[in-house]
UniProtKB/Swiss-Prot annotation:
Protein name: Large ribosomal subunit protein bL20c
Family according to the record: Belongs to the bacterial ribosomal protein bL20 family.
GO biological process, one term: ribosomal large subunit assembly
Keywords for this protein: Chloroplast, Plastid, Ribonucleoprotein, Ribosomal protein, RNA-binding, rRNA-binding
Organism from which the protein derives: Phaeodactylum tricornutum (strain CCAP 1055/1)
Subcellular location: Plastid, Chloroplast
PANTHER family the record matches: 39S RIBOSOMAL PROTEIN L20
Pfam families: Ribosomal_L20
Domain of life according to the entry: Eukaryota
GO MF annotation: an example: structural constituent of ribosome
InterPro entries linked: Ribosomal_bL20, RIBOSOMAL_L20_CS, Ribosomal_protein_bL20_C
GO annotations of cellular component type: chloroplast; ribonucleoprotein complex; ribosome
Amino acid sequence: MVRVKRGNVARKRRKKILALASGYRGAHSVLFRVANQQVMKALRYSYVGRKQKKRIFRRIWISRINAASRLNGISYSQLIHRFKKSNIDLNRKMLSQIAVLDTVAFKTLLNA
């Protein structure tokens, strides 16, 4: 029988997966097969989560802008329309920060 010398490579690969799975409950952090499945699933979730994070933050910014603009008697869609017409180029993240932290500046933006 031919001898295959790959012990170091295989051990290194398994240890890498088990290190990624440390902190998982039960066999998910001890057994290689189960740990490998869980790590692959976790990496998929983290990839999707990074995409969802951007959507979630945009929704938060829009709802904050909407709440602040309605306190001043204008809806969100009308506010964005006004900004587009008067060439005010502020993104939603900046607008929400201004709306939450500096209400006076937000009111002056509404009147512009």
